[in-house]
Amino acid sequence: MPKAPDCSELSDSCSLAGGTGRFSGPLHRAWRMMNFRQRMGWIGVGLYLLASAAAFYYVFEINETYNRLALEHILQHPEEPREGTTWTHSLKARLLSLPFWLWTIIFLIPYLQMFLFLYSCTRADPKTVGYCIIPICLAVICNRHQAFVKASNQISRLQLIDT
């Protein structure tokens, strides 16, 4: 019977080649040390980055189309709004006149918030999940500030006894 190869190296391919069917490298050990929430957090981060790479490619492919439509909109000089113009057409015309950097900022803030939330799910301490979301972060900071003010007021009320 052939002896299985020594899998003490850092390679996971060695364990697959040995026929054991299980990973035994440091990645597998780190994965087994995580709880379910952390594993799902890392899977979510990976899928989110993959989807954002696809969206990033798509956005920069349509950036040229957006610029062309915006230029066409600026070059047209309608004297007065037409009677048959719907509110959706009017809204589309106004939104196309916004610069691309503004659209980038509008979409970047929720994107970063979602990424930071998924990344916070990978933390070992479940109490730290969600601290990076702006409303929660502001609430925590305000709560800490109020606790500090309350503590400093209590200290100032203490009377010093001269001996």
From Swiss-Prot:
Phenotype reported upon loss of the gene: LYSET knockout mice display increased lysosomal enzyme serum levels and storage materials in lysosomes. In addition, LYSET KO embryonic fibroblasts are resistant to infection by EBOV glycoprotein (VSV-EBOV).
Known function: Required for mannose-6-phosphate-dependent trafficking of lysosomal enzymes. LYSET bridges GlcNAc-1-phosphate transferase (GNPTAB), to the membrane-bound transcription factor site-1 protease (MBTPS1), thus allowing proteolytic activation of the GNPTAB. GNPTAB is involved in the regulation of M6P-dependent Golgi-to-lysosome trafficking of lysosomal enzymes. LYSET is thus an essential factor for maturation and delivery of lysosomal hydrolases. Plays an essential function for cells that depend on lysosomal catabolism to generate nutrients.
Record carries keyword rRNA-binding: no
Gene: Lyset
Assembly and interaction partners: Interacts with GNPTAB; this interaction is important for proper localization of GNPTAB in Golgi stacks. Interacts with MBTPS1.
Any single Gene Ontology cellular-component annotation: Golgi apparatus
Family classification: Belongs to the LYSET family.
Transmembrane segments: 40-60, 98-118
Broad class of where this protein is predominantly found: Golgi
Keywords carried by this UniProt record: Golgi apparatus, Membrane, Transmembrane, Transmembrane helix
Record bears the keyword Membrane: yes
Subcellular location field: Golgi apparatus membrane
Membrane topology: Multi-pass membrane protein
InterPro entries: LYSET (IPR028024)
Identification of the protein by name: Lysosomal enzyme trafficking factor
